[in-house]
Amino acid sequence: MIIRSPEPEVKIVVDRDPVKTSFEEWARPGHFSRTLAKGPDTTTWIWNLHADAHDFDSHTGDLEEISRKVFSAHFGQLSIIFLWLSGMYFHGARFSNYEAWLSDPTHIGPSAQVVWPIVGQEILNGDVGGGFRGIQITSGFFQLWRASGITSELQLYCTAIGALIFAALMLFAGWFHYHKAAPKLAWFQDVESMLNHHLAGLLGLGSLSWAGHQIHVSLPINQFLDAGVDPKEIPLPHEFILNRDLLAQLYPSFAEGATPFFTLNWSKYAEFLTFRGGLDPVTGGLWLTDIAHHHLAIAILFLIAGHMYRTNWGIGHGLKDILEAHKGPFTGQGHKGLYEILTTSWHAQLSLNLAMLGSTTIVVAHHMYAMPPYPYLATDYGTQLSLFTHHMWIGGFLIVGAAAHAAIFMVRDYDPTTRYNDLLDRVLRHRDAIISHLNWVCIFLGFHSFGLYIHNDTMSALGRPQDMFSDTAIQLQPIFAQWVQNIHATAPGVTAPGATTSTSLTWGGGELVAVGGKVALLPIPLGTADFLVHHIHAFTIHVTVLILLKGVLFARSSRLIPDKANLGFRFPCDGPGRGGTCQVSAWDHVFLGLFWMYNAISVVIFHFSWKMQSDVWGTISDQGVVTHITGGNFAQSSITINGWLRDFLWAQASQVIQSYGSSLSAYGLFFLGAHFVWAFSLMFLFSGRGYWQELIESIVWAHNKLKVAPATQPRALSIIQGRAVGVTHYLLGGIATTWAFFLARIIAVG
């Protein structure tokens, strides 16, 4: 008989077949709620259906069930993303001029959409060069594809099919992990394991495999492309991977294989893992060898980070211990209790993630132009403007979302009885001081930033240019920004002795990179005009934060409504008979925050668009003379409100306004239509519910008279529904108007 030690018990972390798969639910709209499942009595039903369909908290109070629904929905989201990506790649394969663009990216514009002639729409197919007629695209996919080493439309086609397969796989996973093997709550709360897997797996191995792809596939293919080799002559990706001699012809150290790695002679690899800084003068993008080096380094960091947290082996960090040790002399209990909050409230978790991701997205927007990562991206001005604008809007929305979910956490998940003297409790206890100080800052910034402009407008109108704030009269130079620029410009050889050039040409240093006679990037001068508009940025950002933070800190209670938590996340007023208590819910703060976010981002993208056209983008003559698109007018024109209206909005709108009859005419129609959508929003925002209810009742009377009254009783939108429809159209109209204005302008002149 053999005596064995008892086997360690394996934790079962899934439930088998918890929810029956049935399509019957699909036929019962509102099946998740007892009230909605009864069907519509009034037209309010359809609005409530939309409002609550994804509010899993309202379907059940069981955290495990909520977690499973969210987890499953994430797979659905990934499936849609793969489907969308597949569509992008399919368009590149089937309807684009990618191969032609690859052969001459400086003279041929990217296009992946050809409009069918039905009743004259083929006018939209403009000549993008090389004899191809289509819509010029500004998504940056062509540049991304070239950087990743795609040389033919067949490769794009195969990738599109691959993405479709992945979309199907994700759809299956979403079904499987809800209906067949659903994780237990403990699995969702195992944060150390999650951190290890996400850091080492997603970020670590993800970066490592991308670095591997770049070294073995992208670098050699881009070497050939830069040297002018016909894409059809270049070996296929798998040939580089399977045949080391091919790579060794381009990078001799490949002949030695992994020997330098194991003998610690790493400098051998310096020919394809570089640390150059600056831009490649051939393509105007970052050096791809720098990018490969970066991803390898990032991979190492994340692989190490993914082994830091304590799971089955009893070594490493525990998140709870880290958080509870995190307290200083002035912070009471510090982060004690935060672990419990973040493992039981997904709103709190989501709020943090949205805030981080939103900030990161805005950082990405700025890096995309200052350090353009892909070949021929920097000289494609339409794409540069689109990428910046897109990432700024997305970042703004994510940050407002962070405040929204923080407020939902406060209302639904925060338990004041168990929290005492931790950081969150301390912030809530001195919220009046925080909000009143922030309010003072907003008033100060608003009056002073606008005051500088109004002063300039007045002096300009009185014909007293010598009394204006400008680079040629009373200077307000942004000395701190210039100091930061200078530090970075002089870093190579000083604080960064290994680098040959500074991280970005925008810092200064005098050099300019031009590709095919177009400026890719040059040092960006900052002056009084930038100082003024930066204070407008500070103002709009602080007001957005004031509104959102007030919504979070006063989500549960306020002096006006001490029992606000009982009223929920969104409510119109504190009941009848209490005047002056409308628009105080956390939801209303998010609503107002969205408008200020829109203000803030609009000023940023206007600043960027004009500054780049004035001081960066343009052409360069054989003698080295740079001619900018708007001839450097930013410094003198943007220092008055009138200048912004006349020389930016009005002057640059001429392309979109005069686009009729040209291939840009769709932008003219969008410009008009989006203005209409925006104006339509005002009808919802500036009108009371009672007005519409009265109108509806007289229309219902007429229907009754004619015996055609519907069974479902018509109702005016509730106050909150009306505001939701209003803000949606306001933002949609505003963003689409800006999009049409920017693109018609930059495609025409860029």
Swiss-Prot record:
Q: Which InterPro entries match?
A: PSI_PsaA, PSI_PsaA/B, PSI_PsaA/B_CS, PSI_PsaA/B_sf
Q: Name one GO cellular component term.
A: photosystem I
For the ligand (chlorophyll a), the binding residues are M683, Y691
Pfam families referenced in this protein's UniProt entry, alphabetically: PsaA_PsaB
* Catalytic activities: reduced [plastocyanin] + hnu + oxidized [2Fe-2S]-[ferredoxin] = oxidized [plastocyanin] + reduced [2Fe-2S]-[ferredoxin]
What job does this protein perform?
A: PsaA and PsaB bind P700, the primary electron donor of photosystem I (PSI), as well as the electron acceptors A0, A1 and FX. PSI is a plastocyanin-ferredoxin oxidoreductase, converting photonic excitation into a charge separation, which transfers an electron from the donor P700 chlorophyll pair to the spectroscopically characterized acceptors A0, A1, FX, FA and FB in turn. Oxidized P700 is reduced on the lumenal side of the thylakoid membrane by plastocyanin.
Please give the name of this protein: Photosystem I P700 chlorophyll a apoprotein A1
Native organism: Agrostis stolonifera (Creeping bentgrass)
